[in-house]
Each structure stands twice: as C-alpha cells, then as structure tokens.
Swiss-Prot record:
It catalyses: tRNA(Met) + L-methionine + ATP = L-methionyl-tRNA(Met) + AMP + diphosphate. This is Methionine--tRNA ligase. It comes from Paraburkholderia xenovorans (strain LB400). Pfam families: Anticodon_1, tRNA-synt_1g, tRNA_bind. The keyword ATP-binding applies. Its cofactor is Zn(2+). The keyword Cytoplasm applies. A motif ('HIGH' region) lies at residues 26-36. NCBIfam families: metG, metG_C_term, PRK00133.1. PROSITE patterns: AA_TRNA_LIGASE_I (PS00178), TRBD (PS50886).
C-alpha cells in the first residue's frame, strides 16, 4: 500500500518529510507548449511550497525519448535518434528554465540507469508470473518492413469520409474506430497499403487476480474523487474481470531498450517512460550521495507524488502502481491529475498544431511569471479544464500583480528611503493590519499544499485590497506635505512595506523570480513560511526601489498570436453533404402536428456517431437560466464537456451517475461559458407550451459508456 497521505492541515506539517515529486515526461518529438506548462507550473508551485516548509523535497523529470515517432522524425531530419533527442532535450530544458520550473534533476529516459531499472522491473514481473508471450496480428508496412502503430496509418474516415485521417480517430467528425475500418488505408511512413502480419508480443498480466485485488485496495488512497471513481469504473465490480492485459513490447525497427532474452523485441515506451522517474532520481542520488533504494523500496517512509494530465490517468493509476507493487518497489503516495488547457475556448491539440509554444511567449517579450500567475489563479485540486482567455489574462495580471500588489511597494518605498533612511518604524510592525496578514499566511500555505491555488491567490488578493484601502485612508502623499506628520508617515510606510513583504511571501511559490527581486529590495534572506513572524527591522534598511513588474501590453498579445498564427487556425468542420446544399426548409406542419423530417439513407444515418455516455458530474452554469454543464464519460481516456439546455427539467444532482445517449461526432462548439464537445439527446413534445417537459434519454442498464448506438 502507499505511504501515509499528505497532511493538508493549516500551517507547516510537523516533522521534516522526505518527498519525491514528478511531472509527466514530455515527449522528445516536439516543442514545449503552454498546455504542457500548466502541469509543470502546477507541480513547481507545490514543490516550492513544500521546500518553504523546510522539507527534503526532490523534483525530477526527464525527456520521454523512445518510440516510433522519434525514430521516424530523426530519419526525416537526417539525424540519428540520439542526435534528435539530445537537441530536443536542450530546447525543453531552456523552456523549463525560462518559466522557473525548479527541477532538481532533468534527465532522459534514454539512459543507462533507465535501461537497468526497466530490465529489473520486467524481470521481477516475469519472475512473479505476470508476463505472457502471445502471437498477435498487426498492420505491417511491406516497404519499410515495420509494424505500424495506429497513428502511423491513415485513410478515409469510415464515418464521414474525410480523407487523411489517423488509424484510430477522425479529426473532422470526432469518430473513433479500428485501423481495419479505415477506407483506402496507407502507411504514413512509406505510402504503401498495410498488410496484416503476425508477431509474438509480451504482455503484462494486469488481469491477474493479484493485480486486481491490489488495485482495488490501492485506489482508496487517491486524493481526487474523480480519479477514484474513474479507477473503480475501470476495475468494475468484484468478479467482472474488466482489466485487460497490457502489451509491453514492440517489434524492431524501434528506438528503445531491447527486452532481455527476446532479440528484436523492445519495451513499449509506456513501460520504460514511468521507470524514467526513478532513473532520473537515481542519477540525482548518485550525484548527491542519497540512498536511492531507501526512497523507492517497498515500505519506504519517503513520499512519492506524480502530477499528470487526466488523459494519462489510466497508465499512472493502473499499470504503474501494479508494476511497482509486483517488482518489489514502493507505490505512489498519490497521483494528482489536472484538466486540459483551452485558449479562448478552443482545445489545444499537438497533432492539430493548435498550441502556443513556450518559446514564443519568451520571444515576444511576455514575462513568464505572468503566465505562472494566471494559471495558478485558475488551478484547483480537481481535474477541471481551464481556459486561457487572453483578454482576461491581460486584465488580471495588470489589475492583480501591478495595480494591487506591486503598487503597494511603489507607493511607500520612496518616502521610506528619502525621509527615514530606508528604515522601518519598529513599533509599526505590531499594527493590527499586519497581524491579520500574518494570521492568514498559514492558511494560504495550506491551500497551496492542498493544490487549491486559486483559493490561495484569491485570499492573497483580498489581503492586498485591504492593504491598499489602508494606504488610501492614510494618504501618505498628504502626510508627507506636513513635517508634523512625520511619525504617522513613518508608520504608514512601514506598515505598507511590511505588508508588501508578507504578500510577497504568500506569492513566492507562484512568482519565484519576482520574490527574489523583492528579497534583494528589502535586503532580507530568502523567504520561507516561518518568516511570517519575522518582521522587518530598523536595524536593516531596505534598498532603493526599482520597478518590479510592468503591465501586459496589448501589442505583446498581438505579437504572441502572430507568432503562433498558423497553429491557431480552427480545425475545419465536416462539409455538408452535396445534396443538402441549397435546399430550403420544408414548410412547417399545421399547429399541433409533428413535422416529419425528410427521408435519409442508412449511409446518412451512419454519419452520426451516437454513443452511450455516463454523466459523471453535472453543475449549473453561472449566468445562464437554461444550461447545465455535463461531464461525460464516453469510454475514452478523457471525459467530455457538454452544455445542455435542460436546466428547467433537472437539478444537477438528479443526473449524476445516469447513463444517456450523446452525439459524439458533433463539431465542438465554442460558447460563452466554454467549449461544448457533443450533444446529449432529450425528448420533448412538438408544442412545448401545450405539453411542457424535457426528458433525457436513458439506455437500458446493461449499456456501458462508449458503446455505439446502431
């Protein structure tokens, strides 16, 4: 079982904890974009919070380097895979450094440590009787003489007919399907028509009762209810045997680690990638003289946390803990999943190119800490998606960071330097306003540790409002006009600067570079949480004030959009059928009678992808009288967000847990409240005034999320 869960009580936890933290490993096949940065910023804030408590915390990461895409991209660029991943590593490290991501070690999964650890995990699982060899049939490129992953096969979508769609899903209509269903399939690598070929593969027996029983017990320790519910759904009820065995091998040619005793067979990237967490830490342990085994062996008292996107929850809450448990390692203390990022309501997609790169943020002159603050202001402990609204981004940064926070120092520092030699009034350090700020710091720290960053920052900005109200009431600019007000002016400026120090302490996990500049300005040691009760002193004068932060200029936003314009174009919607163009609507039927739609063919009907969906969450939409926001499980790795105009008929709690039917391939629609990714079906009378009522369709209880309605 996992180590004890984190103590999230207010204030610093008792005792010095040993904590290993990771973020998911970025793939060495492309640039870091701001969707990636949500996770790294979230993790970094948490790590900095724990370090400020004085705990022994190590934050490690690595590039995920293995797999067919890396091999093929290197070939396309005329490089060896090693040359490609070395170059991409430098680019990734540059971007992480620019955004203040404070890795203790940033490594590569293509390392000797990772090869040895991956082999050891595999051999331990084999010794435990959890590895099977089986023959499977796969798509094969007869020209390149290689087996093809689903994403390396393209063809015409079997649902809407769109050309050049991937072997597992259509990016025009949103349908999912098997590669064998593609029309006129071809290999992305050579253009040849794939053939079917049999090969021996190696499987991790996740369906073994030992794995199932372990995972049923382990799932109870997860911090996020959404993750627990999803895992229980994947596990099913006792006796259902819903877990499938996991193919952990790939055939040559492949860039990765060869499986011991299996020439020409390689570990699938999802086996050695998470082991890469340990490999990076082992590399750090060797450099720092740490006892690696004491941290990762079964029964270790150290804590281990993984921050991930909700799309890889399956790997991190099923395969990874089971791999660790049955290879003699400790299991994760917890796994924290976050939602996806949209930009002005549009989903980010690397495969579609709809993303803003981290480097473009730097090159267009935006302060990386602006983005750190904005993301933190939207992040909480759930798996909710978050939206980067660029107008809101500009307004929030300018209002909160410049107008409220930095403004406090700029209003007081000049007077303190000119009139009082930069020294605070010691008696002012006991002011009631400062007492209220100090009392709030432990709760702010606790909110950070609980990953409720939005709550921590909301509380911090409320305190900044109180400080600004104090300054507005005291009017130091008026006090300075009369020498008789010298004591009062000194108090006002001293209270303001100490309040600024406390606000800087509260913001330090989010704005580390700004906090460092503040520490230099105030001539103090690096701030930690315990410093809430260590005020400024007249014995230590502050330094001259220098401008700490500028406002976001609209021209910078324009430059950012221009730099990413090609990747921000909307994905085209499926074209209307030719025979539907130019037709007028049929005349309405007489009042009280149903309108009979035109006859359609079975081919027309087949274009609609109807799926069983489970409503896993439902809430009212603030500002709308008609809409409910539904979170739907459609049997995919991630949930879908749908807005439905059924608020008049249902309370949100009535719908949670119900099965329904949705149109899964409806083009996503940007709405005022967010992105709607489908449509839930409901019935109503033709004349709703005469016969009111909305009725969400419910399938028979035997239906499962993701099943197609045919």
């Amino acid at each position: 079982m996992s180590a004890p869960a984190t103590d999230l009580s207010a204030g610093a936890p008792s005792g010095r904890r040993q904590i290993l933290v990771t973020s998911a490993l970025p793939y060495a096949n492309g640039q870091i974009h701001i969707g990636h940065l949500v996770e790294y910023i979230q993790t970094d804030i948490w790590v900095r919070t724990l370090r400020m408590h004085g705990h022994e915390v190590y934050y490690v990461g690595a590039d995920d380097t293995h797999g067919t895409p890396v091999m093929l991209r290197a070939e396309k660029e005329g490089l060896t895979p090693k040359q490609l991943i070395d170059r991409v590593w430098q680019e990734h490290k540059r971007d992480f450094d620019s955004f203040g991501i404070s890795f203790d070690n940033y490594y590569s999964t293509d390392s000797e440590e990772n090869r040895v650890l991956s082999e050891n995990v595999y051999l331990a699982l084999k010794e435990a009787g959890l590895i099977d060899a089986r023959d499977i049939e796969q798509a094969y490129d007869p020209v390149k003489e290689m087996f093809l992953p689903d994403r390396f096969i393209k063809g015409e979508c079997p649902k809407c007919g769109a050309k050049d769609q991937y072997g597992d899903s259509c990016e025009v209509c949103g349908s999912t399907y098997l590669p064998t269903e593609l029309i006129n399939p071809y290999s992305v690598v050579s253009g040849a028509t794939p053939v079917r070929k049999t090969s021996t593969h190696y499987f991790f027996r996740l369906s073994d009762p030992r794995c199932e029983n372990f995972l049923r017990a382990w799932v109870g320790g997860l911090a996020q209810p959404e993750a627990t519910n999803k895992m229980r759904e994947w596990l099913g009820d006792a006796g259902e045997a819903k877990l499938a065995d996991w193919d952990i091998s790939r055939d040559a040619p492949y860039f990765g680690f060869e499986i011991p005793g299996a020439p020409g067979k390689y570990f699938y990237v999802w086996l050695d990638a998470p082991v890469g967490y340990y490999a990076s830490f082992k590399n750090l342990a060797e450099k720092r003289g740490l006892d690696f085994d004491a941290w990762v062996r079964k029964g270790s008292k150290a804590e281990q946390y993984h921050f991930i996107g909700k799309d890889i929850l399956y790997f991190h809450t099923l395969f990874w803990p089971a791999m660790l448990e049955f290879s003699g390692h400790r299991t994760p203390t917890n796994v924290f999943a976050h939602g996806f990022l949209t930009v002005d309501g549009a989903k980010m997609s690397k495969s579609r190119g709809t993303f803003i790169t981290a480097q473009s943020v730097i090159e267009t002159g935006l302060n990386p800490e602006w983005l750190r603050y904005y993301f933190a202001a939207k992040l909480n402990s759930t798996m909710e998606d978050l939206d980067l609204n660029l107008d809101d981004f500009q307004a929030r940064v300018n209002s909160d960071l410049v107008g409220k926070y930095v403004n406090i120092a700029s209003r007081a520092a000049g007077f303190l330097i000119k009139r009082f030699d930069g020294r605070v009034q010691d008696s002012a350090m006991q002011h009631p306003l400062l007492a209220s700020l100090r009392a709030a710091v432990p709760q702010i720290a606790a909110n950070y540790e609980a990953r409720e960053y939005n709550r921590a920052l909301r509380q911090t900005m409320e305190l900044a409002d109180a400080v600004n109200a104090y300054v507005d009431t005291a009017k130091p600019w008026d006090q300075a006009k009369d020498p008789a007000n010298g004591v009062a002016l000194h108090e006002t400026c001293s209270v303001s600067i100490e309040a600024f120090r406390l606000l800087s302490l509260a913001l330090k996990p989010v704005l580390p570079k700004l906090a460092e500049a503040v520490e230099g300005f105030l001539a103090i040691q690096p701030l930690v949480w315990a410093d809430a009760n260590v005020p400024l002193s007249s014995t230590r004068p502050i330094n001259a004030y220098k401008h700490l932060m500028t406002r976001v200029d609209p021209k910078q936003i324009e430059a950012l959009l221009a730099a990413n314009r090609d990747s921000l174009q909307a994905t085209p919607e499926a074209a209307a059928p030719a025979d539907a163009k130019g037709k007028s609507k049929a005349a309405k039927a007489a009042a009280g009678k149903d309108e009979t739609p035109g006859i359609i063919s079975i081919d027309d009907f087949a274009k609609i992808d109807l799926r069983i969906a489970k409503i896993v969450d439902c809430k009212a939409v603030e500002g709308s009288d008609k809409l409910l926001q539904l979170t739907l499980d459609v049997g995919e790795e991630k949930t879908r967000n749908v807005f439905s105009g059924i608020k008049s008929a249902y309370q949100p709690e009535q719908l949670v847990g119900k099965l329904t039917v949705m149109v899964a391939n409806l083009a996503p629609r940007k709405m005022k409240f967010g992105l709607s990714e489908g449509m839930v079906l409901a019935a109503s009378a033709t004349d709703e005034k005469a016969e009111p009522g909305l009725y969400v369709l419910e399938p028979d209880s035997g239906a499962k999320p993701g099943m197609r309605v045919k």
